[in-house]
Every structure is written in C-alpha cells, then in structure tokens.
C-alpha cells in the first residue's frame, strides 16, 4: 500500500487508542524508549547489527548512545501522534523518518519487527491487543514509506 493508503487505515478509534496509550507510554520517554529498544534486541538479536554505533546494547540505561537513540525514537513517535489529524502532515513526517532507515537499508519487514516489542511494552502498562493493533497500523504507515 501507499503511505497515504496506510495512513487512511488510521480510523478515529485507532487514533483514540494511539493517543490514550501514548499518554502513558510517552510520559517516560527515556524509560519506555530504552525498554522498547532492549526488547527489540532481546527478541530479535539479528537487529543489533543495524545499531553497531550504539556499542554494548546490553548495558541498557547505562549506555549513553542507546539512551540517546531511545529518546530520539520516542520523540519521533510523539511527532507521529501529533500529526494524526492531518494525514498530509503525518505522511511528511513519516517519510522524513523513513529516510534514516532507508539509508541503513532497513526493509519494511525488518522495521516491522518493532511490533513485538511495542506489544510487550504496552502490555507492561496494562494496554492489551486493541492498543498493540493500533500501533501496528501506525507502524504500517512507516513500513509503506520504506
């Protein structure tokens, strides 16, 4: 699907679920960002190869570069949430975000591996499958840009 087409799948209910869960997840960008990244690495060890510049990712919060990447990731998600009501603007920021991943030759399928860690981080905050499915739809918008 096109990026526009994927963005069109973000219904009012999906947007509400994204916003409701983001209120909690986004309130601790550093902690939840590091949790997201360390879960990605634990569950998909082959993804560590894309992040060589981060050094020893098993250090978690003690790794400055991992913390920095995690915080940057969370602000990108904040940007996506902020643009949910304007599809054209959402597409613009998603395409900008995608450039960094295209440069690193991260495919849509590889990028989709973030869905599992998102589901786990959401579950740790008592957000179930409905919320994980909403985030998977947002991830699909990024995947369409890759």
Curated annotation (Swiss-Prot):
The keyword Heme applies. Heme b binds at residue 101. Keywords: Cytoplasm, Heme, Iron, Metal-binding, Oxygen transport, Transport. Transmembrane segments: none annotated. The keyword Transport applies. It is found in: Cytoplasm. One of its GO terms (cellular component) is cytoplasm. Residues 9-146 form the Globin domain. Pfam families: Globin (PF00042). It comes from the Eukaryota. One of its GO terms (molecular function) is oxygen carrier activity. Belongs to the globin family. This is Globin-1.
């Amino acid at each position: 699907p096109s990026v526009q087409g994927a963005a069109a799948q973000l219904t009012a209910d999906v947007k509400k679920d994204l916003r409701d869960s983001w209120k909690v997840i986004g309130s601790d960008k550093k902690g939840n960002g590091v949790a997201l990244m360390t879960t990605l690495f634990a569950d998909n060890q082959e993804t560590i190869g894309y992040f060589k510049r981060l050094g020893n990712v098993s250090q978690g919060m003690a790794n400055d570069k991992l913390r920095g990447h995690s915080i940057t990731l969370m602000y990108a998600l904040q940007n996506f949430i902020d643009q949910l009501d304007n599809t054209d603007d959402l597409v613009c920021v998603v395409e900008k975000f995608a450039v960094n991943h295209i440069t690193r030759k991260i495919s849509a399928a590889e990028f989709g591996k973030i869905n599992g860690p998102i589901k786990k981080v959401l579950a740790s905050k008592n957000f179930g499958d409905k919320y994980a499915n909403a985030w998977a739809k947002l991830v699909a918008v990024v995947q369409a840009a890759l």
